[in-house]
Every structure is written in structure tokens, then in C-alpha cells.
């Protein structure tokens, strides 16, 4: 766990602090942070999602149907619970609630999935299976849903778009159609040659570092104030989602190792894609970025807890 913290979690904290202090010194402005996020959202993130999903194969997805169904139901359920809670309890707009759900209702499986699971459970087929399934659910299902929920409030004339126009608008975003296309290719059995990976990887490597740095810039542009909403987002991401995965997985008699990995994957900090989308559309940036920062620090405490609990009961 110490190796993971130093090698994977500490860099996130350091880069976010670097962005934060750069913002405080006005080396970069909040507008420049949005430009960084536009680069990530339109180019780096779609490339990263495409590469990560096409590494899977259809046999992986159907190898453990119960694992796929449990992950799908719980993650999508937590996504909508987060949206509903933010909209009803904290009186946010539909768009703000959509971004809240993308942050609090989605684990950062693409960036930290293998980094967390491999040192604990080994570089095995099972690890790849869990990461592939959850990655497809987060990137090919919840991101498109989130952008669809976000778009009705973002019409150019200030009026709500129709459901059809919102759907079309969401589908045009590279961060939506790239993972959906990758998932379709996986399901029909089309394998992208490994020799093509460098073509996508060069821009994809900019994804996480630039996104975390820009999150630090965004955090610097707003006064940090811990609130009940930030606590709610952190609780949902670090406690409620892994707890739901554990209980539903036990009820469905999942394989013990798969259950442990699924729970830990669900306990990961919020997906960076939510922060990128927040900054890109200038929606829910302050609370969303603060929720990410608190969740990253909280994960240091909750990760060992979920490892212990899932091993104890599975």
C-alpha cells in the first residue's frame, strides 16, 4: 500500500498542488485552465478511453456475467443517486447535478485501476477483467448519460434543448463517441492491432497529468470551503459505492477475488473526466474540484479499510 501511495497517489497530490500554487501566483489563469481541459476533453481523454477499452475483448466482458451485471447496476445506480441527491437535497440545476454525478458517481478506473489492483492482487486475467468491465461502464455508459443530462441546460439561446437535440449534442462529443465506438468494436470482436497503440498513446499520455494540473488551477481560482455537499460527494464515492458493490456482490455470490477487486475499484477517487467536463462547460467547478481533492486524501484512509473488510467477509 505504501508503494501505491508513493508511486501513484502522491503524484496526483503533488501535481494538483503544483497547479494550485501556479494558479495562486497567477502563472496561469482559470481561462487557461479551461483551455487545458478542452485539450484533454476533446483529444487526450477520448484517445485514452479508446485505447483502454480496446485492450479488452468480448470474452472478458462475458466471462463473468454476474460481475458485469453487479458492476453495471450498482455504478449506474450510484450515478443516478448522486444526480438525484445533488438536484433535490442541494437544490442544484440539472446541469450541475449531472456534473456532480460524473464526479461522485464514477471511479477513476482508467487512471488508477491497474495501479491499485496489480500490486495487491497481481497482474492477472482477473485484474484485467474487473478493470475492463468497470472501465466500459464508466466511460461508455455514465459519461454519455452525464453529457446528455448536462446538455438540456446548455442551449445557445438559454432555453432547454429537446431530448433529441440533447442526445445528438452529447453524441457529437469525442469523449462520448470514442468509448462507445471502442465498446462496439470489442463486442463485435474487432481487435485493434497493438502496433497502432503509439498513435493514440502519445496524445493519451497528456490526459491525466494535464487534467490534474488544471484541477489545481481551478481550485486556486476559488476559495476552498468545506461544505455538507463536499462531504456528501466524498461519502458517496468512498463509502456508499463500495459498500453497495460489496453487499450486492455478496448477495449474488460473486467469486471472492472478483468481489474484493470490484469493491476496491468502486472505492477509487472520482473520475477525472467529471472534473474536465465541469471546467470545460464551467459548471460545478468549485464544489467538484474540492470534492476531488478531499476524496483523493480520503482514499488514503478508506482503501486499506475496504481491502480488510472485503477480505474478511468474502
From Swiss-Prot:
It is found in: Cell membrane. One of its GO terms (biological process) is transmembrane transport. Keywords: Cell membrane, Membrane, Transmembrane, Transmembrane helix, Transport. The keyword Cell wall biogenesis/degradation does not apply. Its main location: membrane. It is a multi-pass membrane protein. GO terms for cellular component: plasma membrane. InterPro entries: Mem_transp_PIN-like (IPR004776), Na+/solute_symporter_sf (IPR038770). The chain crosses the membrane at residues 4-23, 36-53, 68-90, 97-116, 131-153, 174-196, 200-222, 229-251, 261-283, 290-309. Belongs to the auxin efflux carrier (TC 2.A.69) family. NCBIfam families: PRK09903.1. This is Uncharacterized transporter YfdV. It comes from Escherichia coli O6:H1 (strain CFT073 / ATCC 700928 / UPEC). The lineage of its organism: Bacteria, Pseudomonadati, Pseudomonadota, Gammaproteobacteria, Enterobacterales. The gene is yfdV.
Amino acid at each position: 500500500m505504501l508503494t501505491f501511495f508513493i508511486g501513484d497517489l502522491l503524484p496526483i497530490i503533488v501535481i494538483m498542488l503544483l497547479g494550485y500554487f501556479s494558479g495562486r501566483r497567477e502563472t496561469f489563469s482559470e481561462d487557461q485552465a479551461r483551455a487545458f481541459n478542452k485539450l484533454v476533453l476533446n483529444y487526450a481523454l477520448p484517445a485514452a478511453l479508446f485505447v483502454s477499452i480496446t485492450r479488452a475483448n468480448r470474452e472478458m466482458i462475458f466471462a463473468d456475467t454476474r460481475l458485469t451485471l453487479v458492476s453495471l447496476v450498482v455504478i449506474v445506480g450510484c450515478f443516478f443517486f448522486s444526480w438525484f441527491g445533488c438536484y433535490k437535497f442541494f437544490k442544484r440545476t440539472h446541469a450541475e447535478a449531472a456534473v456532480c454525478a460524473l464526479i461522485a458517481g464514477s471511479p477513476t478506473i482508467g487512471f488508477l485501476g491497474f495501479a491499485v489492483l496489480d500490486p495487491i492482487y497481481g497482474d492477472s486475467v482477473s485484474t484485467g477483467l474487473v478493470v475492463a468491465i468497470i472501465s466500459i461502464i464508466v466511460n461508455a455508459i455514465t459519461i454519455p448519460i452525464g453529457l446528455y443530462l448536462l446538455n438540456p441546460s446548455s442551449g445557445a439561446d438559454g432555453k432547454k434543448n429537446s431530448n433529441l437535440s440533447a442526445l445528438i449534442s452529447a453524441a457529437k462529443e469525442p469523449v462520448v463517441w470514442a468509448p462507445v465506438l471502442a465498446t462496439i468494436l470489442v463486442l463485435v470482436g474487432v481487435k485493434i492491432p497493438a502496433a497502432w497503440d503509439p498513435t493514440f498513446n502519445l496524445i493519451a499520455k497528456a490526459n491525466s497529468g494535464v487534467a490534474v494540473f488544471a484541477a489545481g488551477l481551478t481550485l486556486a481560482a476559488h476559495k476552498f470551503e468545506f461544505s455538507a455537499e463536499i462531504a456528501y460527494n466524498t461519502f458517496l464515492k468512498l463509502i456508499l459505492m463500495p459498500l453497495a458493490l460489496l453487499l450486492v456482490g455478496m448477495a449474488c455470490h460473486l467469486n471472492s477475488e472478483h468481489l474484493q477487486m470490484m469493491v476496491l475499484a468502486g472505492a477509487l477517487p472520482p473520475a477525472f473526466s467529471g472534473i474536465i467536463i465541469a471546467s470545460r462547460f464551467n459548471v460545478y467547478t468549485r464544489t467538484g474540484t474540492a470534492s476531488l481533492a478531499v476524496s483523493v486524501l480520503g482514499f488514503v484512509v478508506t482503501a486499506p479499510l475496504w481491502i480488510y473488510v472485503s477480505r474478511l467477509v468474502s
